[in-house]
Amino acid sequence: MQKKLLSGLFWVLLANLIVKPFWMLGIEVGVQNTVGTEMYGFYYAIFSFTYIFNILLDLGVTNFNTRNIAQHPQLIGKHLSGILGIKIVLLGLYLMVTFGVGLLMGYGSEEFRLLGLLTLCQFLNSLILYLRSNFEGLLLFRWDSLFSVLDRVLMIVICGSMLWSPLRERFNIYWFVYAQLAAYSITAVLALAVIGNKAHLKRIRFDRRFLLVILRKSAPFALLVLLMAAYGHIDSIILRPLAGDGQAGIFAGAFRILDALSMIAYLVSVPLLPVYSRLCKNGDRQQIANSTSTVFWPMMGGAIVAALGCSLCAEPLMTLLYHENGITYAPAFRVVIFGIIPIGITYIFGTLLTAGGYLKHLNRFAAISLGLNIAVNLLLIPRYGALGSAWASLTAQSFMAVAQLALAIRLFRLPPNTFRLPQMSDIKQIIKIIKTNNDTL
């Protein structure tokens, strides 16, 4: 199982480390510099709004499906046709709620125009994540790796052709959203074609009984995703009305590198969930400890080095990305970048607790984290703006990480050597597995 885990990590990280840094630090930064901080802050606030309600497109189905297919792969054909029907029903619910809350928040025509486009992007992205969960559950990590970056590759091609051409002078935030919409659409169609062929999908089923059964089983996952999305993205939603589009744009810019690093941590958790799910089903505590040890120090070592390095070089790094405006991003960036350490802990031990079914505990921790985030934001934003939101984000992430780490050690009785530094034999094993993967290309 460790071989499966390392193989999965190799393929997922290889694909994403090639593509996603270029997307985040090349295309997204290029878009923000082109359209301006305030317009990008407006976009980012609406995006965060749609992201928080994104759970209504899924209701925990994706995480439930990864765990369920990993433990019962023979169910993929039945579940694929039924869950696709559920996704279409959930789209209607998502649209009603997002537009309804938008009305209550006093959104105008410009907000609703952007909101409509971004809700479609969120639906397609949610559909892609669900389709990928089937590859993950079957431990088909090469296919998962391909579809984890295909949308970004297409966006790079589309946006790059506009940003680095005479079209740059006319480029606006809506072109950026249209590019996302096109890329997500192509990726979703291709992913559906591949997994549909493997599962012998003939049609999409709208089965009320199946819908209720799946949603009841996935409800705890849904609540967890909602709470984590809220405490991870509530900052800019609170920041915009209290401090304006400019401060929201500064926070978005400071948050971007953390977002890129968080994506790497997330990618480590992608193969972890199906692997942990199978190990928890078998009750193999020793293998759970071994798998945790395999990823703990690479994750923590990388997170600590990245946080310290980025914080020490905050001003030159922000100036490199945002030119003359970079110095205004540095104070918030110095704080928020340390969030990668608790985020890394969360992606390891939160994934383990999810695989073990300890969702009640995770939901309680996430609710407390959300409360902390809101309280610190309301306390600090009036005086410190984006910097206050940075402290709020770090506070919430840190509480969540410490709580999950302590609970995982207690419930799974993880021995002290789980957290030891990797030995030379571990490194040799990783190199051997990577070499084997290269030989089979």
What do these predicted regions represent?
Residues 1-5, 169-177, 189-232, 275, ...:
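Interhelical loop/hinge segments that connect adjacent transmembrane helices in multipass membrane
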Residues 7-20, 46, 55-102, 285-307:
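Membrane-water interface segments that mark the loop-to-transmembrane alpha-helix transition
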Residues 37, 102-118, 245, 285, ...:
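Interfacial segments at transmembrane-helix termini and the short loops linking adjacent helices
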Residues 47-55, 224, 228, 232, ...:
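Transmembrane helix-bundle signature of multi-pass secondary active exporters and lipid flippases
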Residues 68, 124-147, 337-368:
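Membrane-interface junctions at transmembrane-helix termini in multi-pass inner-membrane proteins
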Residues 112, 116-119, 145-197, 368-372, ...:
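Hydrophobic alpha-helical transmembrane segments
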